[in-house]
């Protein structure tokens, strides 16, 4: 992360010059109509008893009507909709505004607080494209009254986690997460086709995990873990939160992963189990950042000790 942060500090202003347009489709002819024959074909193939438009309205209505509308689809019907979270860009901006007003100022000291945390909770909306990291960043910079002149030119390229932007401590900490760690995950996924495999971790990390495979004091099956049926009640609570709310508190996510690493038969099994659970239940799963977070548990982006190296 340090070397990637150094790169960002040297090149970020250039990236600002080519940032996305607010409306990338402006001036582009948009024809969203679908041919009637194609609609009839879709209706026949899916065996729906309604037109596509009627079907969308039924799904949006939710409840038993929505579930019945979704029933013909080949999806995992055991994973229920998360009723406490509403999708869409409007909801994303409401949550962003709330975060900026009530949490950003204490993000640097409160993001790991499980009782009254300062985490943004925006990852599902970012994952589904309901809000852009650019919009979040620009909202913070505007709120802070930031200009390029606030950058600490003397520390540019040193990779400092705080102070380079010239923002408040909370904003500095959040922007580092939003840019450095998020983009690090996407950069890794772009360059490594095996980014979702334990084969992507360094050799020293793989050797270290293998050396400690026999250290496990307790073991559970995948089914027991998915059902949150362990003797660790804190871990069970995190797993239930994942299944019911589609998220795990940031601070508990690392505990969640490390315990699976401890309980699984092997590091490879642990990685597979974490990916399977996260991809199935997490609203921000199936994402480069999910995989880098999981493999951080497996020592990715950490440095070897003299004994390990």
Model-derived features: where do they sit?
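Trp/Phe/Arg-rich N-terminal binding region typifying the photolyase-homology
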Residues: 1-30, 240, 259-289, 293
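Glycine/tryptophan-enriched, flexible segments
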Residues: 2-199
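Secondary-structure transition/capping motifs at alpha-helix termini
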Residues: 143-148, 164-167, 245-249, 263-268, ...
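Short, mixed-charge aromatic SLiMs
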Residues: 162, 180, 203-210, 276-289
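Aromatic-anchored, charged helix-turn/loop surface patch used as a conserved interaction hotspot
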Residues: 176-238
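C-terminal structural cap/anchor segments
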Residues: 224-259, 264-267
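Polar low-complexity intrinsically disordered regions
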Residues: 295-299
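Conserved small/polar residues in nucleotide/adenosyl-binding loops
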Residues: 301-308
């Amino acid at each position: 992360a340090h070397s990637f942060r150094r790169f960002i500090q040297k090149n970020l202003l250039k990236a600002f010059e080519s940032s996305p347009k607010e409306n990338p489709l402006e001036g582009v002819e948009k024809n969203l109509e679908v041919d009637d024959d194609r609609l009839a074909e879709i209706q026949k193939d899916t065996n729906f008893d309604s037109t596509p438009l009627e079907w969308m309205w039924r799904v949006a209505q939710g409840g038993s009507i929505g579930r019945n509308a979704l029933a013909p689809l080949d999806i995992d019907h055991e994973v229920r909709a998360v009723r406490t979270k509403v999708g869409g860009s409007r909801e994303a901006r409401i949550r962003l505004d709330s975060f900026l007003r009530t949490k950003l100022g204490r993000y640097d000291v409160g993001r790991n607080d499980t009782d009254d945390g300062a985490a943004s909770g925006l990852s599902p909306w970012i994952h589904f494209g309901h809000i852009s990291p650019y919009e979040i960043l620009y909202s913070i910079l505007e709120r802070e009254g930031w200009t390029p002149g606030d950058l600490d030119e003397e520390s540019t390229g040193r990779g400092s986690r705080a102070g380079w932007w010239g923002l408040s401590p909370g904003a500095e900490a959040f922007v580092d997460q939003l840019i450095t760690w998020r983009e690090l995950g996407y950069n890794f996924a772009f360059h490594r086709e095996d980014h979702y495999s334990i084969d992507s971790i360094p050799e020293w990390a793989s050797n270290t995990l293998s050396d400690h495979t026999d250290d496990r004091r307790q073991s559970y099956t995948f089914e027991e873990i998915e059902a949150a049926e362990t003797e660790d009640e804190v871990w069970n609570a995190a797993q239930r939160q994942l299944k019911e709310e589609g998220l795990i508190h940031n601070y508990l996510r690392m505990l969640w992963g490390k315990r699976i690493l401890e309980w699984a038969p092997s590091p490879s099994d642990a990685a597979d189990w974490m990916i399977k659970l996260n991809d199935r239940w997490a609203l921000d799963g199936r994402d480069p950042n999910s995989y880098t977070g999981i493999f951080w548990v497996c020592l990715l982006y950490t440095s070897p000790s003299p004994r390990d190296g």
